[in-house]
Amino acid sequence: MKLAITGATGFVGRHLLNLAVAKGHAVRALARRPQDDIDGVEWIEGAIDPAGNLDALVAGADAVIHVAGAINARDRAGFAACNIDGTAAIVTAAQDAGVKRFVHVSSLA
């Protein structure tokens, strides 16, 4: 299965990424900064926002697993920009690309 993963550089996302690769899935993962090469992973430089290269992340994906989220922000607007607007942007990109499966993981209550 071709998976697109956000938040793959965080604690939960990194474990998910490693498990997906170990299970033989092809993974495309979003990262704000360059990452070390990992066999089976294509890194897409971008961010969780409407201009964040999300179309490239989700193109051809069978499923999107959205793990990215702000757990520390300077203010309420900072949380909203990532956790609300960013989530809406990745959902829209996935819908526009015809992705049939979308999993949203969130650790904030």
Short names for language-model regions:
Residues 3, 16-19, 30, 54, ...:
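Generic leucine side-chain signal with a strong bias for well-ordered alpha-helical environments
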